[in-house]
Amino acid sequence: MLVTQSRHNALASVFAGLALMVSACGMSSSGEGAPVAPAGAPAPPSGAPTADPGTPPPAGATGTSTPSVVAGAPIVAPERTWTWVDIAGATCADGSPTGIGVNLTKDSDDVLVFLEGGGACWDAASCWGPAPTAFNVLTGYGKTQFDTDPQIPAIYLLDRSDSDNPFRDKNIVYVPYCTGDSFSGDKVTTFNYLGVDHETHFSGHKNINLYLSRLLGTFPKTTRLWLAGDSAGGFGASFNFGTFQEAFTKARVDVIDDSGQPIDPDPAKWAQWRSVWNMQLPADCADCAKGPSAFVDYYRAKYPTNRFGLISFDYDVIIAPFMSLSLTQFHDELTSMLDHFDTSFTNGHYFVLPGASHVGLVTPTTELKTWVKAMVSGSTNWDSVRP
């Protein structure tokens, strides 16, 4: 995939458009801020060091427990080349088939799974109106969309040519977002917009299990997997952390959550999302029904050796209105959550960028790249950073 200035502008327009969509659906924020512009990504390099496939399961792996997903057929794809893979049974919100993108290497058993971001929708207007608040709901997402997706060359974690990318020599999986439910739903419902019925598939979590089946068959030896995502994909990484860990029983799964902040939205909004999407929350986490903030303590207790990294702006101009919070309210909630990280979450750290924007990985600072590298490498110098 070649990166051009038009691609840079396309991703900037994507986030700007999402902000306008949110406003058009009756939500507003009390601050100002501009969406970020992407950093580019040249073509992948040709070499990579060999990993040791005999490494025993690291701390955090569940070892011999029964996997929750059965391994399916392995994915076969060209080396170090982005390849689209249709996944049987996976659907977008419009019911059309979808799949995943892979960039594989035989030189490592380590895996990065990256979940695409792009808003959310929960009723007729937000899903099927003229300005839907979730990406790819109207269009679906297949090979055509994959081949022109502006996020892939913009996110540096997906760029094999970036010497600062700790995943440049690992297997990379890109999970597109077209279900409008932050990868959490399993429900088919019908919305009527202006007299037209739209069957809507909130199948994000169902799709994840289908993808996991193929990934288990493709990476049977992996002992290290990182689940990352931005915006809705960041929330999806948090929602599906346990699902991945229980599936990859011989691996340790760590999470990089960019702009899917585990803070609680307006209670009515959270209740609506849970109901409309049939949100699939961890069965053994009763408090998770109260809001995303409960996930922090749940993961801390259940996976004490797994790492959880959060990236956020001080004032998130996209997430605040989605949660029906003003920017000031968002900042206060974020600060409270960060304080809780400091006192309660030994293996969870954050990197907070100053200002009002959204998604740090598209224009990463040198300091952010250093922080991500420290997290992935297992460095004991990995710590929290905020303005």
Residue ranges and their predicted role:
Residues 22-24:
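C-terminal motif of bacterial Sec signal peptides marking the signal peptidase cleavage site
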Residues 2-15:
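Bacterial N-terminal signal peptides that target proteins for export
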Residues 26-28, 40, 44-387:
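C-terminal His-loop and adjacent cap/lid subdomain of alpha/beta-hydrolase
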Residues 31-35:
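Long, acidic (E/D-rich), serine/proline-rich intrinsically disordered low-complexity regions
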